[in-house]
Each structure stands twice: as C-alpha cells, then as structure tokens.
C-alpha cells in the first residue's frame, strides 16, 4: 500500500480491527512516519445476469435495491426490510456458486420475497416484471393473492383488501 503522503510503497500495520464487512487497518509509513487507515473488503467473484435478449450484465445490488425500493415506496414496512431482502437475495445468488444466472431467476426470487413482505409491493413489482398488458392480468394476480391469503399473509403484513366486518352485535336493554 503506497503512503498517501509521500507515495512510498512500504508501511507497517499498527492496528487491525474487524468491521462490518471487512478489516480496518491503521498503518504508518516507514519513511515519513505519517499514519493512515485502509479498509479491506471481500470482493466476490463476478456474477452476471443473463437478460431475456441474452445480453450479460454484471449483477448490481444497487439496481436490485432500486427496484425493490420502487415497489415498496410509501409502504409501512419496518426499517431496513428492503435492504435485508436485497442482502438475502445477493447472498443466495453468490452461494449458488454460478458465474451466470438468468434474469428470470432473479425476478422470481424478488417476487417470492415481496409476496412474504407486502402484498401491495408484490403486485407493483409483478405488474412491471410480468409486463402486464391489460387489467385482466393484474386482476388474476390479485385474485390469486386473495384466494391464497391464508398461507401467504404473514404476521404484521397489511391486508390487500379490507376485511369483512362482522355484523354488529345487538345489545338488549335491561328492564
């Protein structure tokens, strides 16, 4: 590592600490004596997404986050939920050990997680990802969500449609 002050290539490590996703090292130049900090992070091997038209594009977590944020915009989700979904998807993709993954696999992973997270975000993402051309396709997705609601809704998730309110109970007056 070259010294940022005198550009000498030698330095000694004074302190080394683990940080969130790597190692922080405090260094001292052996020539000028100036101290500086370096960060080392693991850089996974390149992962490419194969698009529908067979183009290959390097996986970009920021692009994934952007799509997730757009789908979850103005939804009452817990702080960090979108980042966690993106991180989980990224980890799963790298754990597959493949150099290339089809964009359809990535889209299906996003759909699966959004369905568990928030139905509205799921429908928003599905409408773009599945390229709906008319309202009947959207209605079909919503109907599937409503019909399979018992297994699909998780604790804390907002309902897609308002729940039916039970008939008010009749109160009898005492005589």
Curated annotation (Swiss-Prot):
Co-factor remark: Binds 1 zinc ion.
Residue stretches making up the ATP-cone domain: 47-137
Assigned keywords, A-Z: ATP-binding, DNA-binding, Metal-binding, Nucleotide-binding, Repressor, Transcription, Transcription regulation, Zinc, Zinc-finger
GO terms (BP aspect): negative regulation of DNA-templated transcription
Cofactor: Zn(2+)
Molecular function in Gene Ontology: ATP binding; DNA binding; zinc ion binding
Family statement drawn from the similarity comment of this UniProt entry: Belongs to the NrdR family.
UniProt protein name: Transcriptional repressor NrdR
Organism: Dehalococcoides mccartyi (strain ATCC BAA-2100 / JCM 16839 / KCTC 5957 / BAV1)
């Amino acid at each position: 590592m070259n010294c940022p002050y005198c550009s000498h290539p030698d330095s000694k490590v004074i302190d080394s600490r683990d940080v969130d996703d790597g190692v922080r090292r405090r260094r001292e130049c052996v020539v000028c004596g100036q101290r500086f900090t370096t960060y080392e992070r693991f850089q996974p091997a390149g992962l490419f997404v194969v698009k529908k038209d067979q183009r290959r594009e390097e996986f970009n977590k920021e692009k994934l986050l952007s799509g997730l944020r757009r789908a979850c915009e103005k939804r009452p989700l817990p702080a960090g939920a979108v980042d966690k979904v993106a991180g989980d998807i990224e980890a799963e993709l790298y754990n597959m050990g493949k150099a290339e993954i089809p964009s359809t696999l990535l889209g299906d992973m996003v759909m699966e997680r959004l369905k568990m997270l928030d139905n509205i975000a799921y429908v928003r993402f599905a409408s773009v990802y599945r390229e709906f051309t008319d309202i009947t396709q959207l209605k079909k997705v919503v109907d599937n969500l409503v019909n399979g609601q018992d297994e699909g809704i998780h604790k804390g998730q907002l309902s897609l449609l308002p729940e039916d309110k039970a008939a008010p109970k009749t109160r009898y007056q005492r005589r």
